[in-house]
Amino acid sequence: MCGEPGCRHEQTAVKAGRSRNWAGSFAKTPGRLFGVGFIRLYQLTLSGFVGNSCRHIPTCSEYGYEAIARHGLWAGGWMALFRVARCGPGGTSGLDPVPEELDGSKRWWTPWRYWSRHR
């Protein structure tokens, strides 16, 4: 792009555009693979019929993919479900990233605590 010798702008741009989902590494457990596979199946099939109508950045399916990949099927699945619930009319909009780590109050037996309020 810039024409400088040794420039890697073009290589980075091609690599970043490969997938719209989170590209970070995650533990390939059966639950996580099932969850991200299910979301990817939705993205490749039904998402085209529904259209681009998500009010958030990243979209709800991208959020769900990243949440499950980072935090596992249980926690990430609840986070994705609550995100879809917030996406409808009267809900929130704007930038709503997946948290890097979950705080100590979010345990597996208290799924209602995964509901994060957009600030």
From Swiss-Prot:
<keyword id="KW-0997">Cell inner membrane</keyword>
<comment type="similarity">
    <text>Belongs to the UPF0161 family.</text>
</comment>
<comment type="function">
    <text>Could be involved in insertion of integral membrane proteins into the membrane.</text>
</comment>
<protein>
    <recommendedName>
        <fullName>Putative membrane protein insertion efficiency factor</fullName>
    </recommendedName>
</protein>
<dbReference type="Pfam" id="PF01809">
    <property type="entry name" value="YidD"/>
</dbReference>
<keyword id="KW-0472">Membrane</keyword>
<dbReference type="GO" id="GO:0005886">
    <property type="term" value="C:plasma membrane"/>
</dbReference>
<dbReference type="InterPro" id="IPR002696">
    <property type="entry name" value="Membr_insert_effic_factor_YidD"/>
</dbReference>
<keyword id="KW-1003">Cell membrane</keyword>
